[in-house]
Amino acid sequence: RKLSKRKDPEAAVTYYAEEGYPQESVNEYLMTLANSNFEDWRRMNKTEPIEKFPFNLKKMSVSGALFDIVKLTDVSKNVISLMPAKKVFELSYAWAKEYQPQLAELFAQDEAKATAILNIDREGKKPRKDIAKWSDVLDYVSYMYDETFVPNYELNGNATSALAVKVIEEYIKVVNLDD
């Protein structure tokens, strides 16, 4: 169905600012709609600026594009995963000052700590893709701050306490903390 500005909050441009989709992510997503070969180019040129893409009018679809928020979110995860932690900190902190005061307060306490948290598993071959928009950051970092950590020891699904104990006992035998 078509998006409705009354029924669908994502029909308003302000929605994307409030959710914290980075401008870079929106640009990447729009380019996937505009040129059919952009995604192939991006796979081959992961760190190249979008401006280096050889845009070709002949590669534009003749039919109108359909908006896909799931695709935007996926593109955004990829874009953010390639950002240095310092940039993720700066952009998410600036966003939080306006839209999520609790995150802004946590980050203001210790910027170096916040940047270090955001750098966890960011610089390897396969950086983590947990953050799709800045509104995801508080949940992502919450376990690192006493003010936001909520312990949860409930087992999910069909797991029993006996199974959990067995998994931990077996895991202890093979885990290498030096990895």
Label every PLM stretch briefly.
Residues R1-V165, E169:
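Catalytic adenosine-cofactor/nucleotide-binding cores of aminoacyl-tRNA synthetases and other
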Residues I168-D178:
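Short, intrinsically disordered, charge-balanced linker/junction segments flanking boundaries
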